[in-house]
Amino acid sequence: MKWVTLISFIFLFSSATSRNLQRFARDAEHKSEIAHRYNDLKEETFKAVAMITFAQYLQRCSYEGLSKLVKDVVDLAQKCVANEDAPECSKPLPSIILDEICQVEKLRDSYGAMADCCSKADPERNECFLSFKVSQPDFVQPYQRPASDVICQEYQDNRVSFLGHFIYSVARRHPFLYAPAILSFAVDFEHALQSCCKESDVGACLDTKEIVMREKAKGVSVKQQYFCGILKQFGDRVFQARQLIYLSQKYPKAPFSEVSKFVHDSIGVHKECCEGDMVECMDDMARMMSNLCSQQDVFSGKIKDCCEKPIVERSQCIMEAEFDEKPADLPSLVEKYIEDKEVCKSFEAGHDAFMAEFVYEYSRRHPEFSIQLIMRIAKGYESLLEKCCKTDNPAECYANAQEQLNQHIKETQDVVKTNCDLLHDHGEADFLKSILIRYTKKMPQVPTDLLLETGKKMTTIGTKCCQLGEDRRMACSEGYLSIVIHDTCRKQETTPINDNVSQCCSQLYANRRPCFTAMGVDTKYVPPPFNPDMFSFDEKLCSAPAEEREVGQMKLLINLIKRKPQMTEEQIKTIADGFTAMVDKCCKQSDINTCFGEEGANLIVQSRATLGIGA
């Protein structure tokens, strides 16, 4: 590592180091970590978070079974509060949790190879257990709400047990969801009960609220699992850059020094949450948010209401709070980062610190840009300086930096505008067809059902994001698309798709989306032999519910393109028009299946001729 980079690296992380030293000093004051976490969270919250932790590791265990493990840990915590010098009180809390899991009787009978994790030493033991977590598993049913005529009475008679069952159910179904989020959802559910139990139709009231809560839980779970995936795959520095951009956009009035401290603190908390250390995750998240609330005048006036909420509700509220308005008098960055003759001297003297401040300054001026776009802009600017600062006339070399950076902006703006215009002008059905055509051509190896699922996710993103104002549309679109792409790349690791996908997935984090957008037809793909059975037509095309008919037609479209990914838009239209005419004709006949048998055979012959596919 260059000395310059090392020195600037130390400078950049000095605030984080001081914070970490403070944390170690704080922990050193407590001989027992479990005791001080228990004291911080108090009994009810500690119990709830312990239940979340066990439910996320042991997803098949019953509530009663996990309650015994929670009791063991709470008993130990209370013992350690009374006497921190007790021998078993000095262990790290995550080790205490995993030791408890490894003492479960017949662990292997229920969890098979997961039991082998117990033979490993920490932290490998925890990594092993994490690898066995199953997101939204088939063997776990969604939360089953008690009947409307008894739910209010059950809640009133035994609130703690009632909410405990809710927390348990959500945690085991969402094993990567952070504890603060789960407790926030439990509070939302409790508020819904308190409101709906006053209504004449309790069930209808709860149904409406539950739909919103389920969608919210699913969305937050997907995002948090994605954050953990980014941390694991790309490491601290990429995640740090993401956080710096996001927090600079959200709190543009806060000085760089304070935003940097918050970034470093948040990385530590996210790592705890991603590692399954939910008690530490909850405690340190609460402390971080309390620190933020104590500096509202520095960060934002938008979090005032959140900071007045109980600690269990505060974290999620702050995360969902609106961006603060950027200061009106921010000067242009051109003078400092392009026109200044000393740019190279500043860049070379403290590379990381210089780039971090550039990212902060650029981000706080552009809350309308996506995180990924700003990362591409920063990388483009950094690469330009690395090249230009080696020349005899650096200023002349980087004089057109603004134009080069604008290319990144235009590419992203054009992608968003093109897709939102398509959705607006033609509607969701045609938008989905367009997505399926594009991505089947890019990835014809992907199973039909998975392509349809991916297309639906992208259509949902379009519907959600394109209705937003220009100030949020890009960030919303590319943010969610990056999650879909990350999921595709994760699948690519275990089930390779093709060389183009592999190449895009190996790109820098911020370049993945443009790579997927620019990806062309997979020319190496060899279609399977034409099988007429894949294009069977029957009376369901007439009688099935509209949604089912639409799904069937989309699958036919995907399977058709898989036969020849190079087909043109004109060829697709010709075949689609033929299909529509066939359905219109046959659905009016008395013997529908006979008609489909004859007309379907003709359509297949015509389609093969259109595509130039031999017999």
Swiss-Prot record:
Q: Which residues form the signal peptide?
A: 1-18
At the top level, the lineage of the source is Eukaryota
Albumin domain location is 22-214, 215-407, 408-605
Residues reported in the UniProt entry to bind Ca(2+) 2: 40, 283
Binding of Ca(2+) 1, residues = 33, 272, 277, 280
UniProt-annotated binding residues for Zn(2+): 277
Specify the propeptide location in this chain: 19-23
Residues annotated to bind Cu cation = 30
Any GO molecular function: pyridoxal phosphate binding
What InterPro entries does this protein's entry cite?
ALB/AFP/VDB (IPR000264), Serum_albumin-like (IPR020858), Serum_albumin/AFP/Afamin (IPR021177), Serum_albumin_CS (IPR020857), Serum_albumin_N (IPR014760)
Q: Using the chain's own numbering, where are the disulfide bonds?
A: 80-89, 102-118, 117-128, 152-197, 196-205, 228-274, 273-281, 293-307, 306-317, 344-389, 388-397, 420-466, 465-476, 489-505, 504-515, 542-587, 586-595
Query: Where is this protein primarily located?
Result: secreted
Q: What does this protein do?
A: Binds water, Ca(2+), Na(+), K(+), fatty acids, hormones, bilirubin and drugs. Its main function is the regulation of the colloidal osmotic pressure of blood.
Its family? Belongs to the ALB/AFP/VDB family.
Record protein name field: Albumin
Supply the source organism for this entry.
Gallus gallus
